[in-house]
Swiss-Prot record:
One of its GO terms (molecular function) is adenosylhomocysteine nucleosidase activity. This is 5'-methylthioadenosine/S-adenosylhomocysteine nucleosidase. It catalyses: S-adenosyl-L-homocysteine + H2O = S-(5-deoxy-D-ribos-5-yl)-L-homocysteine + adenine; S-methyl-5'-thioadenosine + H2O = 5-(methylsulfanyl)-D-ribose + adenine; 5'-deoxyadenosine + H2O = 5-deoxy-D-ribose + adenine. Substrate binds at G78, I152, M173, E174. Pathway: Amino-acid biosynthesis; L-methionine biosynthesis via salvage pathway; S-methyl-5-thio-alpha-D-ribose 1-phosphate from S-methyl-5'-thioadenosine (hydrolase route): step 1/2.
Amino acid sequence: MKAGIIGAMEQEVTLLRDKIENRQTLTLAGCEIYTGTLNGVDVALLKSGIGKVSAALGTTLLLELCKPDVVINTGSAGGLAATLKVGDIVVSDEVRYHDADVTAFGYEAGQMAGCPAAFKADEKLITAVEQCIHQLDLHAVRGLVVSGDAFINGAAPLAHIRNTFPQAIAVEMEATAIGHVCHQFGTPFVVVRAISDVADQQSHLSFDEFLAVAAKQSSLLVEKLLAHLAQG
């Protein structure tokens, strides 16, 4: 078993990177990949950079060069579900773009031409994540995570997302691109992120203040998940 782990920002990968044993670093095309072992699992940890293009590029490099069996996307997200607060966990059952629109040609909102309307996370990985959440006694919500190249910080964009994707539980900037590439490669994936803000007018202030909290929570869960995967 080899696990690929993806975070966009330094703060989202540093806690995991520091615990990788026999760590080696590969830098390519603006991405950094750290390989070694963590909690008994061979890992390749990617720091992709922010946004959909960086995430897609990095995920492609990760899958081509390291050939992981599964991909775990970690980091922070803006909460949309009413029950979520800072530090809570969101687990994807599927991911969609919130900023793709080819509805003029009969596609669903958020669906890219020639692609599925949503990219489905792997059910076995979801089950494993939920077992780890229960063991850690974390508050989590499972559902749709939406992605786009915008930090949601205001009433109008937030209302648009809520109206277009009323079932969405969280919003961020990379997960759907990661899911898209994993779909193309046939690699199972899951998104496991922690809430840093609630995507409102104060989200930029909340994000800066609580990113470390979100990174700690999501990294804790990823470590637990790796230990679970190591047991088979």
